[in-house]
Amino acid sequence: MRNLDQFIGSQFTWFIGEVLDISDPLLSNRVKVMPYGFYDETIPKENLNWSTVMMPNTSSSYKGFGSNHELMVGSWVVGFFRDGPSAQDAIILGSIASTTDGTIDIPVEAQLNPPTNKVHKTEAGHIIEIDNTSG
């Protein structure tokens, strides 16, 4: 007989939160996130656990190969707790673009000719721009 109480995912607990820290001391692609609704917002970020960032299949995340996340402090993310309602072991699934402070969260360059202009912009201002017009 199966014991579903021990099955990871039997009590799926997801959240939306804000990234508060990206300086993972173990360099393991983790971030500290305030999962809104699970903790009082007055909790110091030092008391939050490090959350693992899930990477795409194009990043092997194995033995020094792959890539690192590009989340920034202030990014809004969606995640879930591997340990269910205990809410101590989080996995970050992705980020959510928003306009929380009145600024659109996609690069200005991408707004110029949507949907054919594909843009990747780093925090330092480096830009990779692709005109994806057919033909």
Residue ranges and their predicted role:
Residues 1-135:
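Hydrophobic packing positions characteristic
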